C-alpha cells in the first residue's frame, strides 16, 4: 500500500490525534489503526529515537520548502517523503503531522521534532517517541 502524502505541508498543519475520534483509535480488520481526521495508520505504533531542533534555524527554509518558525509543527526524517503524514505519540500526548524537513543528523535518532511539535507533545528534548505512518484515509473522510 502506498504512503499517503498530503498535497501541501502547512506550517501549523498538526491535527490532534484525537480530533474527530473522541480520543479513540480503532483497529481495522486489516490490522491498521484509524484516528485523527480519518487517516488510516500503519499499526502497531513503532518506537523511534527523537530529538528536537529549531533555535538558530528560524527563518530558514526546510528541505520541503517551508519557512521554519518557532511555532512550526512538523518532523524531519532522513528518508520518508516530504508531506508523509505521521501520528507521533509521547507519554500520553499525540499529534498528526507531516514530514517537513530532512534529518536528524545525530546517530541513533530517527526523527527531529520542530519546536512546535515538541511543545504539542510535551517532549523533553531527547527520548523515544512512538509513530505510525498514514497509509490512506477511511472511505468518506477527507
Feature map (PLM): residue ranges:
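Secreted/periplasmic proteins
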Residues: 1-142
Amino acid at each position: 500500500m502506498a504512503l499517503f502524502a498530503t498535497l501541501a505541508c502547512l506550517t501549523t498543519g498538526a491535527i490532534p490525534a484525537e480530533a474527530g475520534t473522541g480520543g479513540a483509535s480503532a483497529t481495522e480488520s486489516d490490522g491498521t489503526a484509524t484516528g485523527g481526521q480519518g487517516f488510516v495508520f500503519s499499526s502497531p505504533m513503532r518506537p523511534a529515537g527523537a530529538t528536537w531542533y529549531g533555535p538558530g534555524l528560524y527563518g530558514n527554509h526546510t528541505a520541503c520548502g517551508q519557512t521554519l518558525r518557532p511555532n512550526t509543527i512538523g518532523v524531519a526524517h532522513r528518508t520518508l517523503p516530504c508531506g508523509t503524514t505521521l501520528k507521533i505519540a509521547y507519554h500520553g500526548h499525540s499529534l498528526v503531522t507531516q514530514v517537513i524537513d530532512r534529518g536528524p543528523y545525530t546517530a541513533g535518532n530517527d526523527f527531529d521534532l520542530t519546536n512546535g511539535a515538541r511543545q504539542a507533545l510535551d517532549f523533553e528534548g531527547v527520548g523515544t517517541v512512538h509513530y505510525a505512518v498514514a497509509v490512506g484515509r477511511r472511505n468518506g473522510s477527507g
